[in-house]
Amino acid sequence: MKKFDLKRLAAIIYALAITAMAFLFFTNDFGLVDIRKTAVIIGAGIDLTEGGVSVTAQVAVPQPSENGENTVYIEVEGEGATVADALNVINKKTGFFPKLVFCKLLILGESCRNADIFEVLDYFYRDDYTQLTPVIAMCSGSAGELLASKMRFGNTATVSIERLLSDEAKKSANVSTVNLKMIGIDNFSQSAACYMPYIRARAQSAASPAAQSTGGGGQSGGQSGGEEGGDMQEFLCDRTAIFRGGRFAGILDEEQTFALNLLKNSVRHVFVPCTYEGTVYTLGLRNCRGGAGVRSSGGGAVARLAFSAVVQVSDVGRAEDPRSVSEGVVPEGVLRAGEARLRGLFFSLFSALREADCDALELGTKLFRYDRALYEELEGRVLSSAQLAFEVSLRSAG
């Protein structure tokens, strides 16, 4: 029997491996994807037009480079009868179909106030490539123009707004961050109400050298393909747009937004100013627990707005003995002033929601769960007919 030659077999395997590697190299670059196919949409703005819908997509396009500066951000606009039609127009302009799997931000322009927002957003709930996690917001003016803004901080409008609406910002109670999934659940509940951040742009014509350096640094990791000149922009996201049955119902101001977030979100890093005996105290709150509930009483509904926290004085509008500061004890009068301040904020919020007939606190949904008979009796009138009760408690950290 002929002896099996292992050396010859190894040589054959080696030759086959070299041939296969050469084939991959000369035909497919080892499976590397064409750089044009890696362009992704990171943010999208939607405006309503006379002809239908205008979608402005902010696209991150990788570019070959020797020094690592390899991403350019461009804005591409498409207009059609629906969002899907508008995205198809973007396909015609760019040569690739805009999949939204990496889209992190959706902005509705001011023109969307005149429509049911869920008719506008229908595509995003149907599309297989779209997650339900993109943050959604409404802006003043045009969403397309906002996305093309020249930024003072950050590479692009999408990146800057994403920071402002991050989970950390949400925990400060200053912004009402929500995503597609959250507004869908809220709108199609018994309360039929939802909300989202309202963005305002503010021009900064006299940018400091540091700000200009920040803007230039944005071109290292990414260069905006928007306008070259014009004023720098910064964004304010401290107001909230509210919706009833998918229709725009109004805007909550900064204090009402703050109160809404204290009741709806898990918050920390919270600061509340109050006045006691003519002196302004800024209270730092931790271990915050807030919520809105509803119960039946005497054949009617009572809305209960509850909040509790541990308090320390973060700042005082006068000089104080450092020894008293180190003790960390908050005077009883200051605690009561803080509670009164919070009750005032909650009352302002409840009054604004009642006036707009927008149950953003989900009182109807909660009453439906816990007292179905009373809900059926008050259906559509839970917010307007409910009495209001507060349970606000602050205690000193020291």
Describe the residue ranges of each PLM region.
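Membrane-proximal alpha-helical signals and transmembrane carboxylates
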Residues: 2-398
